């Protein structure tokens, strides 16, 4: 999801900054809907094809796709909110999402007896759903007026292609090492096309979570 949104993140941030400078804030929220639509179409198509060949069960595939779609919208919303310097709102949404995910995970797995993989996937998706809802609520509060084409931001993507490529290459640089480790001696096949490296993934995940609210 971060790879998909990384291509659009910097041009979108520039678009928001330009519209605010020109005092055309009513154009911002429509562009958020357009950016989400484009990224969801591209991302869900590609990730859906991966899931079909991945060996995941139907339920696991649906949960993964649901989580992926939520993440795309969350990362996009964070790009808009960081352009507004609304860091406090992002932090509150992140904390609420963590609490909801842990609570739902405990309830689903340890109380209701849902299988571990499906239960924790659903809990994570629920947590990010909370973050998504709070982020979108913040955006609607900042930009109550809506006017203009939802596709206007694409002009900025075309105009600032170097920014788009910079974002994409930055993301690949940040996460390519994970694929290298998964395919190396530490890597294990979890299921089908899903690979991991527990000795590396756990500290890498904790390090990522510690800077998550600053990555937009």
Range-by-range predicted roles:
Residues 8, 12, 77, 104, ...:
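Hydrophobic/aromatic residues in alpha-helical transmembrane segments
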Residues 8-48:
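Membrane-water interface segments that mark the loop-to-transmembrane alpha-helix transition
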Residues 21, 83-84, 110-114:
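Membrane-helix boundary and inter-helical linker elements of multi-pass secondary transporters
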Residues 27-28, 86-93, 120:
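Alpha-helical transmembrane segments and their helix-entry boundary regions
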Residues 123-144, 150-216:
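Transmembrane helical elements of multi-pass membrane transporters/channels
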């Amino acid at each position: 999801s971060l790879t998909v949104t990384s291509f659009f993140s910097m041009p979108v941030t520039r678009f928001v900054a330009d519209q605010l400078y020109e005092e055309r804030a009513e154009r911002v929220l429509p562009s958020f809907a357009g950016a989400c639509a484009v990224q969801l179409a591209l991302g869900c198509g590609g990730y859906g094809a991966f899931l079909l060949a991945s060996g995941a069960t139907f339920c696991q595939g649906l949960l993964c796709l649901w989580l992926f779609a939520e993440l795309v919208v969350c990362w996009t919303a964070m790009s808009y909110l960081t352009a507004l310097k609304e860091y406090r709102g992002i932090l509150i949404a992140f904390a609420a999402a963590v609490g909801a995910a842990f609570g739902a995970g405990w309830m689903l797995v340890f109380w209701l007896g849902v299988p571990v993989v499906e239960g924790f996937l659903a809990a994570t998706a629920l947590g990010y759903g909370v973050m998504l809802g709070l982020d979108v609520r913040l955006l609607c509060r900042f930009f109550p007026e809506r006017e203009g084409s939802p596709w206007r931001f694409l002009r900025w993507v075309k105009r600032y292609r170097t920014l788009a490529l910079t974002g994409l290459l930055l993301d690949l640089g940040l996460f390519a090492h994970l694929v290298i480790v998964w395919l190396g001696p530490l890597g294990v096949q979890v299921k089908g096309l899903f690979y991991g490296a527990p000795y590396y993934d756990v500290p890498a995940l904790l390090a990522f979570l510690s800077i998550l609210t600053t990555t937009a």
